[in-house]
């Protein structure tokens, strides 16, 4: 599991940062990629990565401001040209369906794959299968804005091979049966339960990806115990008034959310063009006393999300 940042800027593109988009790379977990937001030129940023558009199976839109959605029509069309024929689902606030369908209709674009929309009207679970659960919560922005919590299901425990050997169980196909938790009859007549030879499950990982927002309790709820929290930091430490007036957050407010939520790491994005180079990095330095594991991300950064140590 990795996060690859395709755009980390705020409002409009700059020479250093494109507008909002990131990819949650789930190639090992489900041979797929999930996009979160799709600002202008997202597909151009993808050209600088190993991402294949046909691997994108879901797109989660946080809100309908242009810097988060203007890249959608182009990306969806290019996915058709590049061999994408599997269904794609777009999640987002009410209005996302009208936006996409209008753009495709006016441009007379035809997609080679089924396109499904899930429009959000409130807080709750928006997707669940055997491997992942995605929950959305409303944030505090000028228009409807959501954050997403992606929870991975626990992985089965490993077969404790040494314990199996000590029990005198011969190697071979029996090991596979035990690993599946089956009750097995051994050649010597003994009956053993596979569950007795399997270690504790490995807890799944949790990623919280927030849209534009002011300070809100829902941000803390989304980030509770997260391995990684992606939070906007449009404004610096001492600009609380500006942040409030423009419905955004400061770096300090983002760090406070991470601390309250008990998150493991904080990745600051949605960085204003006023902060360039070391001035952008200072957004992280100024909050290390609040939340040490803080980093300002840049376009095309790839962040590994390992399992927690047992």
UniProtKB/Swiss-Prot annotation:
Family: Belongs to the RNase Z family.
Gene: rnz
Signal peptide range: none
Main function: Zinc phosphodiesterase, which displays some tRNA 3'-processing endonuclease activity. Probably involved in tRNA maturation, by removing a 3'-trailer from precursor tRNA.
InterPro entries: Metallo-B-lactamas (IPR001279), RibonucZ/Hydroxyglut_hydro (IPR036866), RNase_Z/BN (IPR013471)
Catalytic activity: Endonucleolytic cleavage of RNA, removing extra 3' nucleotides from tRNA precursor, generating 3' termini of tRNAs. A 3'-hydroxy group is left at the tRNA terminus and a 5'-phosphoryl group is left at the trailer molecule
Binding site for Zn(2+) 1: 63, 65, 141, 212
Catalytic residue positions: 67
Note on how the cofactor is bound: Binds 2 Zn(2+) ions.
UniProt enzyme class: hydrolase
Coiled coil feature spans: none
Top-rank taxon, per record: Bacteria
SUPFAM superfamilies registered for this protein in UniProt: Metallo-hydrolase/oxidoreductase
Lineage: Bacteria, Bacillati, Bacillota, Bacilli, Lactobacillales
Amino acids binding Zn(2+) 2: 67-68, 212, 270
Cofactor or coenzyme needed: Zn(2+)
Assembly and interaction partners: Homodimer.
A single MF term (Gene Ontology): 3'-tRNA processing endoribonuclease activity
Record's keyword terms, sorted: Endonuclease, Hydrolase, Metal-binding, Nuclease, tRNA processing, Zinc
EC numbers: 3.1.26.11
Any one Pfam family match given in the protein's UniProt record, by short name: Lactamase_B_2
Protein name: Ribonuclease Z
PANTHER family given in the database record: ZINC PHOSPHODIESTERASE ELAC PROTEIN 1 (PTHR46018:SF2)
